[in-house]
UniProtKB/Swiss-Prot annotation:
Phylogenetic lineage: Eukaryota, Fungi, Dikarya, Ascomycota, Taphrinomycotina
Official protein name in the record: Exosome complex exonuclease dis3
Alphabetical keyword list: Cytoplasm, Endonuclease, Exonuclease, Exosome, Hydrolase, Nuclease, Nucleus, RNA-binding, rRNA processing
EC code(s) of this entry: 3.1.13.-, 3.1.26.-
Cofactor(s) required for function per UniProt: Mg(2+)
GO BP terms, alphabetized: exonucleolytic trimming to generate mature 3'-end of 5.8S rRNA from tricistronic rRNA transcript (SSU-rRNA, 5.8S rRNA, LSU-rRNA); exonucleolytic trimming to generate mature 5'-end of 5.8S rRNA from tricistronic rRNA transcript (SSU-rRNA, 5.8S rRNA, LSU-rRNA); nonfunctional rRNA decay; nuclear mRNA surveillance of meiosis-specific transcripts; nuclear mRNA surveillance of mRNA 3'-end processing; nuclear polyadenylation-dependent mRNA catabolic process; nuclear polyadenylation-dependent rRNA catabolic process; nuclear RNA surveillance
Family: Belongs to the RNR ribonuclease family.
Amino acid sequence: MSTVSGLKRPQSSEKNHRDRVFVRATRGKVQKVVREQYLRNDIPCQSRACPLCRSKLPKDSRGNVLEPILSEKPMFLEKFGHHYLIPDSNIFYHCIDALEHPNNFFDVIILQTVFSEISSKSIPLYNRMKRLCQEKTKRFTPFSNEFFVDTFVERLDDESANDRNDRAIRNAASWFASHLASLGIKIVLLTDDRENARLAAEQGIQVSTLKDYVQYLPDSEILLDMVSAIADAIASKEQVESGTKNVYELHWSMSRLLACIKNGEVHKGLINISTYNYLEGSVVVPGYNKPVLVSGRENLNRAVQGDIVCIQILPQDQWKTEAEEIADDDEDVVVSTAAEPDSARINDLELITKRNAHPTAKVVGILKRNWRPYVGHVDNATIAQSKGGSQQTVLLTPMDRRVPKIRFRTRQAPRLVGRRIVVAIDLWDASSRYPEGHFVRDLGEMETKEAETEALLLEYDVQHRPFPKAVLDCLPEEGHNWKVPADKTHPLWKNRKDFRDKLICSIDPPGCQDIDDALHACVLPNGNYEVGVHIADVTHFVKPNTSMDSEAASRGTTVYLVDKRIDMLPMLLGTDLCSLRPYVERFAFSCIWEMDENANIIKVHFTKSVIASKEAFSYADAQARIDDQKMQDPLTQGMRVLLKLSKILKQKRMDEGALNLASPEVRIQTDNETSDPMDVEIKQLLETNSLVEEFMLLANISVAQKIYDAFPQTAVLRRHAAPPLTNFDSLQDILRVCKGMHLKCDTSKSLAKSLDECVDPKEPYFNTLLRILTTRCMLSAEYFCSGTFAPPDFRHYGLASPIYTHFTSPIRRYADVLAHRQLAAAIDYETINPSLSDKSRLIEICNGINYRHRMAQMAGRASIEYYVGQALKGGVAEEDAYVIKVFKNGFVVFIARFGLEGIVYTKSLSSVLEPNVEYVEDEYKLNIEIRDQPKPQTVQIQMFQQVRVRVTTVRDEHSGKQKVQITLVY
């Protein structure tokens, strides 16, 4: 497509309106496309020192003039004077970690050109830039140079898009410098592009590389660690080009990869690295019954967990099974930046090809990197103690065992020993055994609660910054004094039902403050029951297309850790105005059923409402009240009706094939004052837990059907696909060999039935253990937009429901907020917002909240694991455990008491002579001969076996951190 540029000259202005004319030729036809671009002259510079732009400042929704962002007297540096910064796109792309430093880089102008370039390369980086603009103390401001008459530039005929953008950045910097010159404020253009810097200097623009600039800042030593990797990367590339020996095969070119994907020579997919063996990954490929195995350092070829890779299937005689050994820590440490000789490398695990081998492949290219900031600690063995404060190369050992060690350069090496730090990967050349990165920040001393919690939040990408002012400005002005209007003629009462006289209560975990749901039940004159589920009316406060709505969508969910909660919504809403607390009036969204004695639904209707909860119970308190026959008040009788009906509803679900799976859930008892862990206990589930669950499920199903009927293409639903039968192959074989049992997995109903039948009278816990392992064969449930799947694929496999959504927790889940908006439109309470009719936008939102949901779950589990370790610190516990995986050099056990999994290495069974180990693969068994006893003995370990283990925490001398150690008691 060729481009013709023209200038349209309206009578009012010659400069403010441009046409861009594109001439497109398709199949011999010429089509002219005209795109108009209007240029403005009223965009302010955002400097508080500038009197000329005062009249151009925008106003907020209340008509108040918004104050300029940039300070009146910006930072003074001897070389640059008082100045504002304009970084180019590459500075943000490569060095945003440095720009985010809390004590440096203030008064920064982000040009629209830069925003556009970054958004096309990396949406996560683009979002980080937007968040910087929301941080009041940093004073980062966007500037629409592409729409400003004095800074817009046309692309020249012989000019590349990149060169045009560089020129636009220089032009904007030149305008700012001229505009602010009389105020004594200078502009510094930050760029590491030599040609861009040369051209800027020729235009008289003050220019600096980032590395030169940070040398003048107070925290220069830390900042230099954060930016030096870019210069090192350039040097590394020059070294590769000069003939440095490669450790890995070169990746194929992008054009070759795309062509080979098209012709089927290679396959693309997301790579998952094994949690037991960092040298083994797998990729799900359409057409293969099992995930394709990628085994060994060379075959992984620099792929990192979560990368989108291209793989080439190896010849069948090179196919392998999954690793039979647990890969221990990488013991050989090499920090040289040159390619290492073969003798310095760790030998990859040797795997034997067997009759049931997996399709095996090698990585030939990477389509999309999943690099992120990684939390870990400096490997002490890589620190040269004699170097003092000079820069040296060290290795980061990431917390995530699936991630390789990361090489980075730092001047702070001795000070970083024993610290939790964050490092980002910059590149991984074929000549380097390890990826290269740069230091981002120090989180604090390892094993301190603050540092480990911060590390956990970063590792699982939990957004935990304070809510920005733009979000807080969306809250009601009355704050905690907000009340439901007393006058029912008030507009806020319009189309709301008054349910304040209903005997409504909530039942939640102890100490719950963000109460999403409440219930009631009563007998109707015709003998049927009225049952109501009342959900916090969050969407009354959180409106579409507001800063609060964007923030909630970005966070996706509230994250629950042992000692804290990371809220999706500001606390004023989550724990007060939206929370269905007792004894106060609250707005709600109610789902009301009429049911008969057998819990058959006669009719259902939905309405916005006003409720006044009569009581807030914990599960235990509600159970005690129901069980106390002295309590015959109407509220308690209503709770008994709810319990009776919930049991019928549950049985109906089970009869339809709903799965009763198991997952380990523990509760950490903490000190009330310090939040230090004191003990670990298994969560006790009561009938009231099931009571609440059944009615929440019923409400979600009822709402799902309603919004799908109203919006068949854009309803936000939740599906749980049936797992492929091959997911059960390994578990089926283990069951057959070790127990002589079999699971029927063709439907959820047959699976539920066979799970009930798999009972070992000698081992009461076996059935629970089997349900835990069956859960791991399942696919994850996911949010989706109804127009993207056929109705049969809406089904929720685990719940045995043909349709499902999430409606009942809008305080803590953004998916529920969307369902509330769609339901409100479906009952004609309000018109549908255009954003909820945009299928492509909803698909994007669903993908985002699916990701946030997964991360929140993993963060919660990691928090429990950390606190279990802290509760055990300094002590020794002997507990029953169950073998759930067997390798050549160890076995994995599950300790039900702590909900903890851990590895028992066979070498730990002897203190002097290493045991002789016979691995009986076909029987999932280890015969371990322990030789340093007065009389040698043989210990036998097999899948599902109950064993006694000793659990302690020990300080790892190599890493300097505490870790749980599990040994066999025999």
